Amino acid sequence: MAKEFLIELGTEELPPTQLRTLAEAFAANFEAELKGAELTHEGVKWYAAPRRLALKVTALAEHQADKIVEKRGPAVSAAFDADGNATKAAQGWARGCGITVDQAERMITDKGEWLLFKQEVKGQPTADIVVELAAKALAGLPIAKPMRWGNKTTQFIRPVKTLTMLMGSDLIQGEILGVASDRVIRGHRFMGEREFTIESAEQYPSILEERGKVMADYEARKAIILADAQKAAAAIGGIADLEDDLVEEVTSLVEWPVVLTAKFEEEFLKVPAEALVYTMKGDQKYFPVYTEDKQLLPNFIFVSNIESKEPRYVIEGNEKVVRPRLADAEFFFNTDRKSKLIDRLPMLENAIFQQQLGTIKDKTDRITELAGYIAEQIGADVEKSKRAGLLAKCDLMTSMVFEFTDTQGVMGMHYARHDGEAEEVAVALNEQYMPRFAGDDLPSNGVSSAVAMADKLDTIVGIFGIGQAPKGSDPFALRRASLGVLRIIVEYGYNLDLVDLVAKAKSLFAQQDGTSRLTNDNVEQEVIEFMLGRFRAWYQDEGFSVDIIQAVLARRPTKPADFDQRVKAVSHFRELEAAEALAAANKRVGNILAKFDGELAADIDLALLREDAEKVLAENVEVMTEALEPAFATGNYQEALSKLADLREPVDAFFDNVMVMADDEALKTNRLTLLNNLRNLFLQIADISLLQK
């Protein structure tokens, strides 16, 4: 027999940004516990609302199945002595099983005969064990900072108020997190019934919706919010900004979603849209509305948690709440524009970037110099890049950015435009932080790219230079910064070398007295290794296999664009018919050469070539060496590897017909030189011996 099973945990308000994670983890943990207990079912569905987590299990078995447990003992040969008496090992095993040796059965396998004990284990009723299973599932939730409440020692993410566990219509007796199970379910705080009883698991969640005015189905609430917000925006001729993270957060904040539209005064549209949007989304959890051409409308959409008979009062209330915040943004914008960005530069002397690395003004000076250096390398406007570097952090000293921190960069752009700075300079102030996250847009031009790379490299080299490389945590976001630099270089194809960039960045930490702010003598090597390590993570995410990435990293290419070409070339080579054989041959060659202690000449001695197979291979290697020079010079590694694939037959013939480690020392050394030259052709691209089958 099987029944519906329900568990609902009623709590105080759960953290909205963690609600989905908690619910999904609860379901996954409980399903794993059911599997471990060998309880069959047809599925587990999770429910989550601001004040509850719930699971409903379809067709959960009411009883564990009976089963036969086998316990194998010692081999018969070890269980009895020469006189046929049971050994101590056999007697001890039998005692542990609660039987005598004579009562043991025998089991014959291809490895011999063994003593065996079979025991029938009766399955337990689900009602007797499900409380413990649920408690274990809850104990395994990802809760960083659990709370205690009252005088209890129990801990959970928020205080627990109610617990309901039903198997069909039967109440499961038990206690979890200090709360005893009963049939009482709490409804909405302001609508429906505050409390009511539930008779069976099948009634959930519909009874909660009907009587308690709580929509427990998270995905259903989210779907309503999305659909109604889109309709509301369309009704005023706009498009709602329904960013998924914000939609998720709002879904986690409401039990009964009611979507409403409000407005604000058009005069606020004179303020940069980013500042208004920051207020609406960040502070108030409102959805901005745009025209089709991305112009902000004087409206916003919000989600109420109550169904009011007079929604206009709810709308007016939200308009009153947001108006002072928008007025603040307007005031800050107007006040900030009374001073030019460049006039705020001296103020950066009073802001510490990092105690050992100096002020933000010190960082600005380094960014300015490094941005100019990079701009020269990539063909961008050097003076504009240096100007953008000089102004890059000035908006940190504005009232707007101080109050609305997420507007840094974008406000710098608006203020720079107001000050009459060149457009490329203004844009660079916003784009210096790009890419902000995986998949984010890159800076749109060379000036922006130069400043963005300079800012990130200064931070990376500086933090590594004072011995604070990231371990587990990464407080300075150096992994993200490194990936940002690599993406800009690779995706724009800039011919930049990390060795040069890091060395230049390091040099800028020199102080007037000739000393450096940096104390780590190995900073250059550590930074380059760290950044090369970011390649592995990035290219794995792009779908390249680990062995391909490692084959290229083995050659330690420090030009990111060059690394990219190598990885793509090796990936293409791997699909060729000859790839597996040549990878194996390279591995064999590497092993042979590793055992040789002597020195090898650069060129082979043609007079010492005796076998036809080695003559053919030598000729092919010589021809290939000359033919591939243009491809290597231009970084056309795919063409080079495609040609090297033609060496499969002469390489196979060589190993089939030539004794490399000949008794004649001269012959042996000459053949090793030939193999070394062969391997070096491949090593100019990657160590293909690392490729797996």
From Swiss-Prot:
SUPFAM superfamilies recorded: HD-domain/PDEase-like (SSF109604)
The keyword Metal-binding is assigned to this record: no
Swiss-Prot/TrEMBL keywords: Aminoacyl-tRNA synthetase, ATP-binding, Cytoplasm, Ligase, Nucleotide-binding, Protein biosynthesis
Catalytic activity line of the entry: tRNA(Gly) + glycine + ATP = glycyl-tRNA(Gly) + AMP + diphosphate
A single cellular component GO annotation: cytosol
Primary location: cytoplasm
Subcellular location: Cytoplasm
EC number: 6.1.1.14
Gene Ontology terms, MF aspect: arginine-tRNA ligase activity; ATP binding; glycine-tRNA ligase activity
InterPro entries attached to this UniProt entry: DALR_anticod-bd (IPR008909), Gly-tRNA-synth_bsu (IPR015944), Gly-tRNA-synth_heterodimer (IPR006194)
Highest taxon in the source lineage: Bacteria
Example GO BP: glycyl-tRNA aminoacylation
Family classification: Belongs to the class-II aminoacyl-tRNA synthetase family.
PANTHER family, A to Z: GLYCINE--TRNA LIGASE, CHLOROPLASTIC_MITOCHONDRIAL 2, GLYCYL-TRNA SYNTHETASE
Assembly and interaction partners: Tetramer of two alpha and two beta subunits.
Protein name: Glycine--tRNA ligase beta subunit
